[in-house]
Amino acid sequence: MTMSTNNCESMTSYFTNSYMGADMHHGHYPGNGVTDLDAQQMHHYSQNPNHQGNMPYPRFPPYDRMPYYNGQGMDQQQQQHQGYSRPDSPSSQVGGVMPQAQTNGLPTGGQLVAQQQQQQPQQQSQTPQQQQAQQPQQQQQQLQQLPQVTQQVTHPQQQQQQQQQQQQPVVYASCKLQAAVGVGLGMVPEGGSPPLVDQMTGHHMNAQMSLPHHMGHPQAQLGYTDVGVPDVTEVHQNHHNMGMYGQQQTGVPPVGAPPQAMMHQGQGPPQMHQGHLPGQHTPPSQNPNSQSSGMPSPLYPWMRSQFGKCQERKRGRQTYTRYQTLELEKEFHFNRYLTRRRRIEIAHALCLTERQIKIWFQNRRMKWKKENKTKGEPGSGGEGDEITPPNSPQ
């Protein structure tokens, strides 16, 4: 154990002698544990919260969260107004000091960077005990700095580039920067997404991301009308009106419409909102005989009832008029068998079909044969040749 402790002390002394003073070898710090680093931070981070009142309002851009996306405008104001606090920047948490232009006797950015480089190996060479002793101090500093306004950290190289960009036209590195600056100037970005507002927190940001999926719910509390973007309620009303207009175009029938209108809707555009309209969706399978007064639909053969008086017509029996019967009897008296040519002529003359003419003549011959059988059977053999001649065309 003694060898290990001696080795640890020798290694500790090796690192601490080269980078630390004698009073800081074993974790003993002067005063209240505040190092020179905190004294340097006092130049840059003012502990007076009322000091922020010196900043002009409105700032550019007029949003507190915009410095996360655009650090150029805030750096210009920091060069003009010294002492404006940058509380929870990473440089204050890790022990670095943010560079600042040399004004009113303050150190320049190059000197602060050199001091930061000297202090970084000191922090690396500290033992775990010393780091644990510094942790509560750093946590207290962070708690004091949290209530102040959050801003973005810029390094010396970025500051030099931003000074060059002041003379040159601004070129944005990403679309988010351009959208954020455009909203700050009062322009609406191409995507149509509303800007970030002062009171907007992470919950409101999530609600903003899910806004297109919940257009039906008005979200006027987000304050989108301040920047010239139309209100969500107006968008919802326009969406509702367009939906009603689309329903009128699709041909959804009114409540009292007959079922015939439902039958002819297949010729129009597809009905998208028909199933979502209660009271207007009538089943197309209603019986046409029970329809209300209005346009009477034509009675097709497949619509006729299979029972009742219409059952006799199912046999297809044709009723001939007295004129048609008289003309057919005349033709049968002169010729009991018809040729095809004569059959066509009679069909056109009597407004009948060839099949009807053929069937009538067949029935008439059978009737005539029965009449001859009943009159005298001895003469039926001689009359048989007249009934069915051998060369009669059928």
UniProtKB/Swiss-Prot annotation:
It is found in: Nucleus. Keywords: Developmental protein, DNA-binding, Homeobox, Nucleus, Repeat. Residues 313-372 bind DNA. InterPro entries: Antp_homeobox, HD, HD_metazoa, Homeobox_antennapedia, Homeobox_Antennapedia_CS, Homeobox_CS, Homeodomain-like_sf. Pfam families: Homeodomain. One of its GO terms (molecular function) is RNA polymerase II cis-regulatory region sequence-specific DNA binding. It comes from the Eukaryota. A motif (Antp-type hexapeptide) lies at residues 299-304. CDD domains: homeodomain (cd00086). SUPFAM superfamilies: Homeodomain-like. Residues 71-83, 111-135, 258-297 have a biased composition (Low complexity). The keyword Repeat applies. GO terms for biological process: anterior/posterior axis specification; negative regulation of transcription by RNA polymerase II; specification of segmental identity, thorax. Residues 44-53, 88-106 have a biased composition (Polar residues). Its main location: nucleus. One of its GO terms (cellular component) is nucleus. Residues 44-135, 256-300, 368-394 are annotated as: Disordered. The keyword Nucleus applies. Sequence-specific transcription factor which is part of a developmental regulatory system that regulates segmental identity in the mesothorax. Provides cells with specific positional identities on the anterior-posterior axis. Belongs to the Antp homeobox family. This is Homeotic protein antennapedia. It comes from Drosophila subobscura (Fruit fly). The gene is Antp.
